[in-house]
Amino acid sequence: MIRKIVLGLTVAAFACTGAALAQGIKRTPLQKIDFPAGYTTVTAIAEIPAGGSAGRHTHPGVETGYVIEGEGDLMIDGQPTKHLKPGDSWAIPAGAIHDAKVSGDKPLKIMAIYIVEKDKPLATPVP
């Protein structure tokens, strides 16, 4: 019984860590399915307010996306900064530390697809 409580609290702590990351980004899930085996695929709309950033973080799987509105800079550790505008897309390898910062005076709105290891938090903040 105690083990189940400790496990539950540990899972809740990881979930809260992901929520803390969300201070600069709002994710609205559109679909979440357990596919392929051992992974969860999440399709979401993500929005970052003007002047904001997502905060440095990682995902336990790949992220791909498409810019709907606004502009921003995508910084992936070890790669040149990529400026994104409506119609642009990107791919981020599993575990890569990255951040997105809005440029201009409009919010950045994207559609993102995450294929992450099942039962792991969608995002984990890093310093």
Segments from the language model and where they lie:
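A short, N-terminal "cap"/entry segment at the start of jelly-roll beta-barrel domains
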Residues: 2-45, 75, 83, 91, ...
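Extracytoplasmic
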Residues: 41-43, 59-62, 79, 95, ...
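Soluble periplasmic/extracytoplasmic beta-strand elements of cell-envelope proteins
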Residues: 43, 47, 73, 111-114
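Short, conserved beta-strand element in jelly-roll/cupin
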Residues: 47-48, 60-74
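Short acidic-glycine-tyrosine-enriched beta hairpin
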Residues: 48-49, 72, 78-95
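Sec/Tat-exported extracytoplasmic proteins
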Residues: 52, 68-71, 76, 114-117
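His/acidic/aromatic-lined binding-pocket segments of jelly-roll/cupin-type domains
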Residues: 56-58, 62-67, 82, 89-90
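Ligand-binding loop in jelly-roll beta-barrel domains
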Residues: 95-119
